[in-house]
């Protein structure tokens, strides 16, 4: 059996150890030895964009928080008008380099698309600095509302974080939040912070059973 090969390593600002590993053509990003995402199972990352980018207007501007393996950015670009903009925010520089290097072909080189605008930084800061800017915001940060790998990401899923997301969206704008597991109280939290919220159970691997993830969507009311 072929071993997993470490292709790249990085430390996030809070000290979380990230690894890009490869085995027989499959790539996985791990956080402190726990798998976060895989090139083999990425359907939920694609759906994260499809759920809130399917009816975008000319000139639309969207934000993706968390680059991952690039699949959400690719899915958003596939739905974005020719004159639209997709702002991709990623905190860890090495993750960006991996997506420009060995990971690039898997999602069809989305960072090379002229509609992509790459921001290396904290998505929470990017959200707080925006007001009535985005038609859609997609967040694939950590494991979602819970359980968190890094506590620095908790703010995004609090009342204050959701209020900031709402403020960054245009009227009628939509947010999609990826979650590894269900969080029973999160729907009510979204609703009390001004969203018409829904929950979607999504297969990790299209057309197959097994692992399911949750995507919370909300429209700004």
Residue ranges: model-predicted function:
Residues 32, 41, 100-101:
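Surface loops and adjacent helix of pleckstrin homology
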Residues 25-31, 140-145:
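Short, basic/glycine-rich phosphate-binding loops at helix/coil junctions
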Residues 1-30:
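N-terminal auxiliary segments of SAM/dcSAM-dependent transferases
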Residues 217-221:
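Conserved beta strand-loop-helix elements of the APE1-like EEP
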Residues 173:
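Glycine-centered, phosphate/nucleic-acid-interacting loop/turn motifs that mediate DNA/RNA or nucleotide
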Residues 35-48:
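Conserved SAM-binding loop and adjacent beta-strand
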Residues 46-169, 177-180, 187, 193, ...:
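The AdoMet/dcAdoMet-binding core of the Class I SAM-like
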